[in-house]
Amino acid sequence: QLGEHAKKYPAQLSGGQRQRIAIARALIAQPKVLLMDEPFSALDALTRENLQNTVLDLCEQQQLTLVIVTHSIEEAIFLGQKIAVFSDHSGTLRHIGENRHSGQANYRGTAEFYEHCNLLRSWIGGQVHEN
């Protein structure tokens, strides 16, 4: 689906387009595990959500395990079937939790989604927001 973008230099592409290319490059090797470190952090909210959905679809189609490192609580809650919280300095595992609603399109914006966000905030030690 490169279309008109096929002959462009990377600097001429948007952040979302560059991110899609990076994901495609990673998938060429047909990995069993897709490891992503802050893959959506520099993107606007709508592009971020679209790419999150794309990655989840690809993982399902290709039967990939997704391991993602993120500082975004909402991203962790939406994408993570299992969510691990590590300590700031020593890197020791502080909490791990299951998320049976991960990746469900109608999950974002629900009361349960925000409850899980608040639970994750409490695990991290951050302030819990009232909704």
Per-segment meaning from a language model:
Residues 48-62:
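Helical segment within the ABC ATPase nucleotide-binding domain
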Residues 8-11, 29:
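Conserved signature/switch motifs of ABC ATPase nucleotide-binding domains
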Residues 88-119:
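Conserved beta-strand-loop-alpha-helix hinge in the C-terminal portion
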Residues 63-69:
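Conserved H-loop
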Residues 1-4, 57:
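Conserved ABC ATPase "signature" region
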Residues 23:
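Hydrophobic anchor residue at the start of the ABC signature
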Residues 14:
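ABC transporter NBD signature
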Residues 34-37:
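Catalytic Walker B motif of ABC-type/P-loop ATPase nucleotide-binding domains
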